């Protein structure tokens, strides 16, 4: 049984420190635009499966990244599926906001976050950070539950801002994803 939120505790590093990545890995990990749009372009049928959407405590690292004093945030965990095959596990951390304009990011159901945020011209993004998740990482419990082969995985994360509202998005490419 998987406990949410799935831990993505790892040695997140700036992309420049990953010199051993293949061209396919670089293409997918450093995609500056919507990963959702890129996945849609590579598949006949794209869908989102919500695994969990609930409020959780922020870690000290997450609070620091978000630059907030709040201790909780909405955590949304989804699978991005291409042709009914899970290819990306995504996790977003959305602090509560007093600004009603940002409520569109809460209660999205199976709508892809990328379809919403990349339509906003005020969206900004920090540099992408990369992490490796070895076969002993707790993320492998999800991989096993999905009946996918265990292998070292690559993930990326970025801090996004819409006006003054900051939120964190982490994406891990599952076994069989296009970048492997």
Curated annotation (Swiss-Prot):
Main location group = cytoplasm
Quote the catalytic activity from the record.
chorismate = 4-hydroxybenzoate + pyruvate
Q: Which keywords fit this entry according to its UniProt record?
A: Cytoplasm, Lyase, Pyruvate, Ubiquinone biosynthesis
The record's Pfam families line, in alphabetical order, gives: Chor_lyase
Q: Where does substrate bind?
A: 76, 113, 171
Q: Which GO terms describe its molecular function?
A: chorismate lyase activity
Which pathway does it serve? Cofactor biosynthesis; ubiquinone biosynthesis
Which Gene Ontology terms describe the biological processes this protein takes part in? pyruvate biosynthetic process; ubiquinone biosynthetic process
- Gene Ontology CC, one term: cytosol
Subcellular localization, as worded in the UniProt entry: Cytoplasm
Q: What is its EC number?
A: 4.1.3.40
Which InterPro entries does the record cross-reference, listed alphabetically? Chorismate--pyruvate_lyase, Chorismate_lyase_/UTRA_dom_sf
Entry-linked Gene3D superfamilies = Chorismate lyase-like
**Summary of the function given for this chain in its UniProt record:** Removes the pyruvyl group from chorismate, with concomitant aromatization of the ring, to provide 4-hydroxybenzoate (4HB) for the ubiquinone pathway.
Q: Which family does it belong to?
A: Belongs to the UbiC family.
* Protein name, entry field: Probable chorismate pyruvate-lyase
Which species is this UniProt entry from? Pseudoalteromonas translucida (strain TAC 125)
Gene expressing this chain? ubiC
